[in-house]
Amino acid sequence: MHQKLLKSAHYIELGSYQYWPVLVPRGIRLYTYEQIPVSLKDNPYITDGYRAYLPSRLCIKSLFILSNETVNIWSHLLGFFLFFTLGIYDMTSVLPSASASREDFVICSICLFCFQVCMLCSVGYHLFSCHRSEKTCRRWMALDYAGISIGILGCYVSGVFYAFYCNNYWRQVYLITVLAMILAVFFAQIHPSYLTQQWQRLRPIIFCSVSGYGVIPTLHWVWLNGGVSAPIVQDFAPRVIVMYVIALLAFLFYISKVPERYFPGQLNYLGSSHQIWHVLAVVMLYWWHQSTVYVMQYRHSKPCPDYVSHL
């Protein structure tokens, strides 16, 4: 029996000269970088552990095997359950205890819903990227990109709402601007041309622009509240900075393909840049959720100052 199991096992390398047998269900096999279709060849430093040429049923079944996508899938699947659980907890405990208004419930619901959609789109892509139909793979890739935009939208909606809580005019201006910008990017992402080679360099630029736009309302918010010496600025601005630092760190891992660039073939299953990007994405969204709850409680505990209300 033991020999039969070993015959059906795929041996993976976890560190130098350490090989471990991994059982793979019938109909699924793991491929090397040279064996996979061109559409999957994104990172030459990940040399093994690829799923490919699978029908939908086996794509779903591959959720429970160890491949180079396992951490990517489960990190955001668990991230989805994290934000789903936080949603229930917020609606039943956190918001009622803070005497939250109906608007607070709506904003927090939108924020967490966007985070959950972001997580699920990522899970869907990494689960079905091995589909035998390249068209199906590309559709899921487009949804993955769109999911990132939706996650960014969740950050903007909650951030703008509470930053300009006392400035209804500017709150509406920035919310409409952000919504229009995200919708434009969303429709571009689901267009077939977005995933072509011609757009390869433009895609990260678009994401950086959409994310970096948040600096404009942030600086405006600091000015409206009386500068960096204002208590709310000193309380909340560091949280915004931490979020951007996490996002920048995640993006640097994503584009640099570090650390596997320096250890090709050694980080196929654990510790690759894309896995770090995924974990940092969950950390960033969780941090922003906690910051949103913090500033919401702050807004309910302290009234709007007169010099802000009339601007």
From Swiss-Prot:
Transmembrane segments: 71-91, 105-125, 146-166, 173-193, 204-224, 236-256, 276-296
Topology class, membrane: Multi-pass membrane protein
Name of the gene encoding the protein in the UniProt record: Paqr3
Keyword Calcium: no
Lumenal topological intervals: 92-104, 167-172, 225-235, 297-311
Record lineage: Eukaryota, Metazoa, Chordata, Craniata, Vertebrata
Location of the region described as Golgi targeting in the Swiss-Prot/TrEMBL record: 61-71, 299-303
Main localization of the protein described in the UniProt heading: Golgi
Organism expressing this protein natively: Mus musculus (Mouse)
Protein name: Progestin and adipoQ receptor family member 3
Required for interaction with SREBF2, as annotated region: 1-20
Family designation: Belongs to the ADIPOR family.
Sequence ranges on the Cytoplasmic membrane side: 1-70, 126-145, 194-203, 257-275
Task performed by this protein: Golgi-anchored protein which modulates its interactors acitivies by tethering them to the Golgi apparatus. Functions as a spatial regulator of RAF1 kinase by sequestrating it to the Golgi apparatus. Acts as a positive regulator of cholesterol biosynthesis by mediating the anchoring of the SCAP:SREBP complex in the Golgi apparatus, thereby promoting SCAP:SREBF2 complex formation, potentiating SREBF2 and SREBF1 processing and enhancing lipid synthesis.
